[in-house]
From Swiss-Prot:
Gene name linked to the record: Mrpl58
Protein name according to UniProt: Large ribosomal subunit protein mL62
Organism: Mus musculus
Transmembrane domains' residue ranges: none
GO BP annotations listed: mitochondrial translation; mitochondrial translational termination; rescue of stalled ribosome
Residue numbers of N5-methylglutamine PTMs: 90
Entry-linked SUPFAM superfamilies: Peptidyl-tRNA hydrolase domain-like (SSF110916)
Length: 206
């Protein structure tokens, strides 16, 4: 039995490995090596937000933006979960995977006042009667992915509202003026045609 075992594993009398062990044995050895480590998914919060500390999720504002704050304080947000709508397979009506994030926009001092005002004008359909900005996500069957998408929506809103519109060049201003003049000429021409058509109809009826 020992001889057969030695031949099977390709071992010499001194214990030197002559042949590579089977693949399943290599996998077992690999599993034994990683038993002491902690596995983290690529979608874990530590990897999605590597600069996050405690309840604050760090976010770098673009250089061209005026927004001074560089983080989204999670403790200032109201986060809740509910059941998603639509088809969900085995999870339908069983798992609270839909994420909802809301916060009072007017009192969100971690966003500059001009940025808050622009967000209130641009996304007024997302603000309820209590003045809360409500964002939802149910694109994934996992809570943390939907939560990450809601936070990304907040970042996109802040970045969009923080951008300073650039001044048009002289050439762009000239082209814009020519387009407006052309539109006005076409509008007056159509107006004259309609007036002439109505006049001809009255003359025909008389």
């Amino acid at each position: 039995m020992a001889t057969a075992w030695g031949l099977r594993w390709g071992l010499s009398r001194t214990g030197t490995l002559l042949l590579a062990p089977p693949a399943r044995c290599a996998r077992r050895a690999l599993h034994r090596q990683v038993d002491g480590t902690t596995f983290q998914s690529i979608y874990s919060l530590d990897k999605l937000y590597p600069e996050s500390k405690g309840a604050d999720t760090a976010w770098k504002v673009p250089e061209h933006a005026k927004q001074a704050s560089s983080y989204i304080p999670l403790d200032r947000l109201s986060i809740s979960y509910c059941r998603s709508s639509g088809p969900g397979g085995q999870n339908v009506n069983k798992v609270n995977s839909k994420a909802e994030v809301r916060f009072h926009l007017a009192s969100a001092d971690w966003i500059e006042e001009p940025v808050r005002q622009k967000i209130a004008l641009t996304h007024k359909n997302k603000i309820n009667k209590a003045g809360e900005l409500v964002l939802t996500s149910e694109s994934s069957r996992y809570q943390f992915r939907n939560l990450a998408e809601c936070l990304q929506k907040i970042r996109d809103m802040i970045a969009e509202a923080s951008q300073v519109p650039k001044e048009p060049s002289k050439e762009d201003a000239r082209l814009q003026r020519l387009r407006i003049e052309k539109m006005n000429r076409e509008r007056l021409r159509q107006k004259r045609l309609n007036s002439a058509l109505k006049t001809s109809r009255r003359m025909t009826m008389d």
